[in-house]
Design a protein with these regions (language model features):
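Nucleic-acid endonuclease domains
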Residues: 1-79, 84-180
Length: 180
């Protein structure tokens, strides 16, 4: 018999055991206050992102109004705003990229707000509709639409998605663009 043994009762003294019990070894969000939001359905999560943004800018003293139609989510300081949120994806227990989806340049909005959530924070970014549209609608040298969301890259469905980090997108600037 080996002299190097961990008895069953002593496994409780090891941090990795607690990590496994609480899924921290495979889920960076396991002890995050953002986890309940991450686990919501897409529709509910989207509504949460909209309400969080409205409440956040209201705390800044900005004016929030109801949308004029279903093509935008809210009006902030008189500007029509569409809101997109993403949690950092987890692959093999590691945090990877963000993915913002359902970007539709044909809709009636002036600005797009992007929420970037990871286990410890939620950051807000903002871009003009024109900047976002110019970026996502590009056609590459092979005739593909690299940001197209539906139907593959060879077609232009009018709905786009972007993967990466805010620093990867020149249009993701300060939320202060909406400040009057």
């Amino acid at each position: 018999m080996s002299k190097h043994i961990i008895q069953e009762d002593y496994i409780l003294n090891y941090m990795i055991y607690d990590d496994v019990l609480n899924n921290r070894d495979i889920d960076p969000y396991s002890d995050s206050k953002f986890r309940p939001i991450k686990n919501m359905t897409s529709k509910r999560k989207g509504r949460f992102f909209e309400q969080l943004t409205e409440e956040y800018v209201d705390h800044l003293g900005w004016k929030v109004s109801k949308p004029e139609n279903s093509d935008h989510d809210t009006i902030i300081n008189g500007k029509k705003v569409e809101i997109k949120g993403s949690f950092r994806w987890v692959v093999d227990g590691q945090l990877t990229h963000y993915r913002w989806q359902q970007i539709r340049p044909s809709q009636d909005y002036e600005y797009m707000v992007f929420l970037a959530l990871d286990p410890r924070k939620c950051e807000f970014y903002c871009g003009t509709k024109q900047e976002v549209s110019d970026f996502v609608t590009i056609q590459d040298s092979n005739g593909n639409y690299p940001y197209n969301q539906h139907g593959g890259m060879t077609m232009n469905s009018g709905t786009y998605r972007i993967d990466g980090f805010p620093k990867d997108f020149p249009f993701m600037k300060s939320l202060d663009q909406l400040a009057v």
